[in-house]
Amino acid sequence: MADPHSILKKVFGYDSFRPGQEDIVRRLLAGQDVLAVMPTGAGKSICYQVPALLLPGITIVVSPLVSLMKDQVGALVQAGVAAAFLNNSLTDNQKALMLRRAREGWYKIIYVAPERLEMPGFQRFAQEKLISMVTVDEAHCISQWGQDFRPSYLRIKAFVDSLPNRPVVGAFTATATARVRDDIRSHLELHQPYEVTTGFDRPNLYFETRRALPSQKPKELLDLVLREGDNAGIVYCSTTKQVDETARLLQSRGIRAAAYHAKLDAEVRRKNQDDFLYDRVQIMVATNAFGMGIDKPNVRFVIHYNMPKDLESYYQEAGRAGRDGLPSRCILLYSGTDVRTIRFFIDKEMEADNGLPADVKAEAARKAEERLKYMTFYSTTQKCLRRFMLNYFGEAAPEKCGNCSCCLFAEQNAQEVEQRAAAAKQRAAANSRRLSSRRAAVGGDLSEADEKLLAALYALRKRLAAKQNVPAYMVFSDATLREMVQSKPLSMDEFLNITGVGEKKAARYGMAFLRAIEDMVGSRE
């Protein structure tokens, strides 16, 4: 029987687990429930995907968004894993075909929305087959204290209880205060769970806050975006009107930008999201409707044009940057108007006729006001931003991180901050190197010759992705390409030693990359 390490290497192409991952994998394999709080980019999915391939039956992954399911399943299929998703983006015929194949044993991992668990057809399927594990992704959605509460998550427990044999349950989230963790534990009725918080810190992320009047924000944004060159980024706005105006502003300056919000036609949203994932668009301007579950690893900056409603939302949205571990920037543009806008939405929620009792709505408003208070403190503090954020999530931190605007430039204005941004990126790269010797190879500067090789590998990846009709990062991540440049593998064995190269991907893409590397290396000798 295969062991977790062999699955990790053969399927996903990693030599070793990240901190916290192996313990979670082994607990799930032993049948112990798990509650794991791991920051975006820490590798939550590996924690349930590896045991899913080792357990005898099927793993059901409960996921809140169609985009997350599509992204995760696409990456698994590229790695050679039998995975599928079942949601309303499929036609009735496609759903019927997927369920028939699931009954026939085609799949090891199936992603579904929580609402799907209540549907008779899916319940019959789950009764017939061995469900070995139920994974609850974005588990904070089960808590009224969480920033993304979804009542449908409260019905996951009933589904688990209805199965002939209780599966092991794993609950995963990137952001959860102690109150939210209590809710997850109780609402899912986890059985003596193994609880782990791997730490919220993302050393490769540089955090910055800027106070700017609404009239100043367009210029601030343009300056920030233009300094990023061709880097992929996300700009978050608080209203759909602001999203549309900001996208038009960027487009008017020749920047490849697209908009994403709930008022756009579903087909337009899908196209714009795909354009961003496939690198046809450089910048996505969006409300918080965009991002949860988006697994694009090479987002180099996230700018919040408006202050979010709480630190949970901010940390999750900012965490879309730098998922590949390379230095990235998270910048918040703050004005007092942002607070008034958020209070307007809180009051609107109170007045909504949503069937909730008045006392429940009042309590929800009180919780929202409390979270807003801490978000405002973060936006205006002159102390270390990273420390403030980590302390909010219950984690100790040094007094100064050396990689946020308050630590580096407390006495300087925004123009001076920009002049020293390169130094901040260097510090982030140094922090990333301390995390992992393997990452050391991917974070540093490259020689001119290696830059040409990297450009050739990027171009090759783009062509291969187009043939497969998948986003480029699903072929190989930026970090994997950088390691290829550093290591310059010239044989399949050497290629398989590159982080992120599993056996299926090596078989599919290996010879093309080896030829490209050999052509460039040979031309210099």
Q: Which residues does each PLM region occupy?
A:
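Accessory DNA-binding and partner-docking regions appended to nucleic-acid-acting proteins
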Residues: 1-4, 340-341, 346-361, 367-373, ...
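Helicase motor core with emphasis on the C-terminal RecA-like subdomain
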Residues: 2-11, 15-19, 23-45, 52-55, ...
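Short alpha-helical "packing" element that flanks the helix-turn-helix/winged-helix DNA-binding module
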Residues: 21-24, 375, 481
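Short alpha-helical segment immediately N-terminal to, or the first helix within
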Residues: 27, 304, 378, 483-484
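Conserved catalytic helix of short-chain dehydrogenase/reductases
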Residues: 67
